[in-house]
Amino acid sequence: MINYYLLLTKPGIILGNLVTVMAGFLLASKGQFQFGLFFSTILGLAFIMASGCVFNNYIDLEKDRLMKRTQNRPLVIGVIFEKQAIVFGLALAIVGAIILYFYTNLLTLVIAELGFIIYVFFYSIWKSRTVYGTAIGSLAGAVPPLVGYCAVSNQLDLGAFILFAMMVFWQMPHFFSIAIYRLQDYSAANIPVLPLKKGIQITKIRILLYIIIFTLTSSLLTFFHFTGSLYLILTIGLGLTWLLMGLRGLKTSNDQQWAQQMFRFSLVIISVLSLTIPFDLVN
């Protein structure tokens, strides 16, 4: 039974986001690592993200029944009841908020809660009503590195805004790739993603534009002397690779396979850049 509750929290999403939390935390630390603060930030935000995912499962319940990839989720198959999920989600949110309030700072808690509100009350509810759901979701998804950064700095400065913008622009091609790859599922659930509303070709062009913007935005960390040349080289190299993969998609005969490759590479690029940041800081 514990495993089903764990599945409700979408642990894969949490772990992926914690990599970017680490990047933000270490960028702001500038070599002065505080283990206790790092642990508290990771733990507190993990609880809040887990809560958001539980409520997302609850809100998406009827849609999840219609999509093949979500038909075996705990709420769908009935191993966990809706009221139990709500109580579980509330408990996670409270614990996470307590940890961040007492062991980090108020700004960090406020940013984390804003991310939670955007994800649960805006993205989860509106993604089935508007094609702009992806853009709304990208705002929530850009919060984790900001939380890591502000836990150390306790302020919103240029570094924080660059990190936030990076994640917003990364998530757009990331989500659009998923939308193309899982197009049949989204169609079955009547979720108005861009490929369904505007067509796959227009979505591919949007992907290319966002990859360019993401690469340029990511490079700003070096231009403003937060990171060194290694980070810049990797940013440009991986960004160009991603862009070339995207260009090949304009003529591909297998959109689903191409979109899956784009999705996987999006995970590679954000992971590599996040892990490079702490090793190439400019003090």
From Swiss-Prot:
Pfam families: UbiA
Pathway: Porphyrin-containing compound metabolism; heme O biosynthesis; heme O from protoheme: step 1/1
Catalyzed reaction equations: heme b + (2E,6E)-farnesyl diphosphate + H2O = Fe(II)-heme o + diphosphate
Domain of life: Bacteria
Entry EC number(s): 2.5.1.141
Group of enzyme by EC: transferase
Protein family according to the UniProt entry: Belongs to the UbiA prenyltransferase family. Protoheme IX farnesyltransferase subfamily.
Protein name: Protoheme IX farnesyltransferase
Native species: Protochlamydia amoebophila (strain UWE25)
